[in-house]
Amino acid sequence: MKLHGKTIVITGSSSGIGGEVARLARFEGARVIGIDRNDTLLTLDGFVKMDLGDPAVIDAAITALPDRIDGLVNAAGVPGTVNSDIVARVNYLGLRHLTEALVPRMLKGASIVNIASILGADWPHRLDAHKELAAAASFVLGKAWLDTNPVQQENCYQYFKEALIVWTKKRSLELFMQDNIRMNSVAPGPVFTPILGDFVSMLGQERVDRDSALVKRPALPDEIAGPIVFLLSDDARWIVGANLPIDGGIEAAYV
Ligand SMILES: NC(=O)c1ccc[n+]([C@@H]2O[C@H](COP(=O)([O-])OP(=O)(O)OC[C@H]3O[C@@H](n4cnc5c(N)ncnc54)[C@H](O)[C@@H]3O)[C@@H](O)[C@H]2O)c1
């Protein structure tokens, strides 16, 4: 069992990829605590209902989380069809806030996995902006930076997935050197989950048709969960700051 004896916190555990990671992590021996804004139907070792877009709610609710944590999977997310302010709060600012709040509870060797996306693949094109946002390290500072550097609704999902990849890389080095905590991200291509339809509305049929020609099919959530569980495990102990594509080859097809 790859995660025997580990305590893993998983956001977005009530649906899709987060739910599948929760199921597989328990199967691999972990004690799993789920977090979501929606109730869960899964068998978990604990569940905390919270809105990850509000730092005050996060601060109040994390008292219910364990004092000692071996892993965190940030799977909660919203598509770009919702308001860009909510995308910023849930997919980036709240994710960072929760992660930083839990770092002091993480044991040496702990692993954090952030779910980015193939849609964040253009991060090198806006690297300077993403580094500036990463340096605005708190929720409040990040929000202030975004107020002076507004992100368009049309590409907000892509923007904050790019920003997440860059923050993961920048912050992972400090976490590994200072606290022996590993942080990585994964970049799935399309996955059969309830938000897949939103991506079609978000990207438009033409882009979806173009990308569809590059892949055999969307992934099933368990095809994403396996690599995430690997990154949580000690087998991945020398993997730090990586952004792992799990996309059936789409990224390779862009070359
Ligand atoms: N499905 C895809 O094609 C795909 C592709 C690449 C990346 N992703 C990313 O994978 C992650 C998981 O998405 P999914 O496909 O499993 O979607 P999903 O909708 O099935 O699951 C997302 C979960 O996040 C929760 N959530 C959303 N907002 C929240 C909030 N404010 N507070 C607490 N919980 C909240 C939802 O309740 C839901 O349970 C997301 O970050 C998404 O951007 C998905």
Located regions from the model:
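C-terminal helical subdomain
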Residues: 97, 156-158, 162-165, 185, ...
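A glycine/serine/threonine-rich, flexible loop-to-helix segment
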Residues: 126-134, 178, 191-213, 253-255
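Rossmann-fold cofactor-recognition segment
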Residues: 42-56
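Conserved SDR Rossmann-fold cofactor-binding beta-strand/turn motif
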Residues: 116-117, 182-194, 232, 245-247
